C-alpha cells in the first residue's frame, strides 16, 4: 500500500513508517520534525519565523499538494497538523479526503474531545482538569480550555474526527475518552516501541 503519515509526535510516526517499510509498504512521512526534536521526515513542512511566516508557509503547503494525493491511507497525527490557523486548515484536510482512499485521524494528544471528556465526564479519578471532585484552575489546565472550548480550533477538530474513517488511540486513556464519542471507529493501537538499540545498554550496578 501507499501510505502518507502527516506530522509526528515523539517518533510515533517515525517508528510506524519504519515498520511499514519493513513490511514492504511505500510510506511518506510529512512533518516539521516535531519542532526542536528534529525528527526525520521525507517532506519538510517546518514553518519559518518572521512577520510573513504564515503566508510563506501557506504558499509552501499549497505547492506541495500534488505530492499528497493518490495514497491508500493518510494518517494524521492530530487534526491540527498543518501548522496554520484552524480556519485555514479546512481546505487542506478536504484535499486529502478528496484525493486519497481513506483518512485516519490519530487520537495521540490533546484536542477538543480530550478537553470535553475531562471537563464533563470525568472518566478518570484525576486528570488534566479534575483531581477527584476538585476542578483544576491552574494555568496549564486553563490553557487547554481556552484553546479548544468554543473556538475555531475546537470546531475544526470535531469536523475532522467526525469525518475520518478511523481513529486509532495510542494509550488506554485516549481509548477510554474517544470510545465514548466514537465507539465504532475508535481502536486501541499501542505505541510502537523499537527494541533494537544501536548501542548496548549497561545495567547500573549502584557503585
Name each model-derived stretch.
Residues 114-115, 145-186:
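A short, active-site helix/loop in glycosyltransferases that binds the activated sugar's phosphate group
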Residues 2-6, 66-88, 102-106:
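Short N-terminal targeting/anchoring amphipathic segment
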Residues 47-67:
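Glycine-rich, highly charged phosphate/nucleotide-binding loops
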Residues 176-206:
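Acidic anion/phosphate-binding donor-loop and adjacent secondary structure
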Residues 105-150:
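Acceptor-binding helix/loop patch of EC 2.4 sugar-transfer enzymes
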Residues 1-43, 98-102, 164:
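N-terminal subdomain of nucleotide-sugar transferases
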Residues 68, 119-124, 158-163:
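A conserved, positively charged/aromatic
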Amino acid at each position: 500500500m501507499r501510505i502518507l503519515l502527516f506530522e509526528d509526535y515523539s517518533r510515533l510516526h517515525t517508528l510506524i513508517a519504519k515498520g511499514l517499510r519493513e513490511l514492504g509498504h511505500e510510506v511518506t512521512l510529512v512533518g516539521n520534525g516535531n519542532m526542536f526534536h528534529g525528527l526525520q521526515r521525507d517532506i519538510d513542512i517546518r514553518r519559518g519565523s518572521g512577520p510573513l511566516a504564515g503566508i510563506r508557509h501557506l504558499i509552501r503547503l499549497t505547492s506541495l499538494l500534488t505530492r499528497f494525493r493518490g495514497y491508500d491511507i493518510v494518517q494524521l497525527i492530530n487534526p491540527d497538523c498543518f501548522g496554520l490557523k484552524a480556519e485555514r486548515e479546512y481546505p487542506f484536510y478536504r484535499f486529502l479526503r478528496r484525493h486519497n482512499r481513506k483518512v485516519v485521524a490519530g487520537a495521540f494528544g490533546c484536542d477538543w474531545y480530550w478537553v470535553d471528556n475531562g471537563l464533563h465526564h470525568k472518566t478518570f479519578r484525576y486528570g488534566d482538569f479534575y483531581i477527584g471532585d476538585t476542578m483544576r484552575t491552574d494555568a496549564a489546565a486553563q490553557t487547554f480550555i481556552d484553546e479548544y472550548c468554543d473556538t475555531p480550533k475546537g470546531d475544526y477538530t470535531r469536523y475532522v474526527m467526525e469525518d475520518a474513517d478511523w481513529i486509532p488511540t495510542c494509550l488506554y486513556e485516549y481509548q477510554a475518552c474517544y470510545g465514548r464519542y466514537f465507539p465504532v471507529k475508535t481502536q486501541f493501537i499501542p505505541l510502537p516501541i523499537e527494541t533494537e538499540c544501536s548501542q548496548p545498554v549497561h545495567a547500573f550496578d549502584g557503585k
